[in-house]
């Protein structure tokens, strides 16, 4: 198969990502188990300045970018989350339903806490699946990095294209 191009900004273009600091986890006990192996997973807002990992069919609010192992706030580990309004995200289709260009996606079940979503180099990708009902507000498939939309395809998803 021919080499695929990757959807990237034009040379010299500055497209900022929207990165924010959040407390991590549904509760302090869960937060204590989060490690750098969880980077790349899809997250949702669950409280005041707090996110937790998405489960199947959740709306994706962002992607975990970093975990501060020695910094806490209110008993929770702290990390950086890239907001879903940032330009582009890498994702892996982990559900049996295929996707096509511009299909909307939601979270699929992420790997267990402390376990990467995949093997390198695909371990920092969100696990996604096709949304059952489109609403025009979700991340959309804008490029296939590998595969053609079947299970295991690596995708580029975005809210600003399509």
Where are these regions (language model features)?
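Surface-exposed, low-hydrophobicity beta-strand/loop segments enriched in small/polar/acidic residues
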Residues: 1-162
């Amino acid at each position: 198969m021919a080499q695929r191009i990757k959807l990237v900004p034009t040379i010299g273009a500055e497209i900022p990502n929207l990165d924010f600091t959040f407390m991590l986890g549904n509760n302090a006990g869960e937060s204590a188990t989060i490690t750098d192996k969880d980077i790349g997973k899809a997250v949702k807002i669950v409280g005041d300045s707090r996110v937790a990992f998405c489960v199947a069919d959740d709306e994706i609010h962002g992607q975990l970018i970093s975990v501060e192992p020695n910094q806490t706030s209110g008993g929770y580990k702290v990390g950086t989350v890239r907001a879903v309004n940032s330009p582009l995200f890498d994702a892996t289709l982990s559900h049996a339903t295929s996707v096509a260009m511009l299909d909307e996606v939601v979270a699929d079940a992420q790997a267990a806490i402390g376990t990467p979503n995949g093997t390198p180099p695909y371990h920092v990708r969100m696990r996604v699946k096709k949304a059952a009902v489109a609403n025009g507000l979700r991340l959309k498939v804008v490029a296939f990095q590998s595969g053609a939309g079947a299970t295991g395809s690596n995708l580029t998803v975005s809210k600003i294209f399509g």
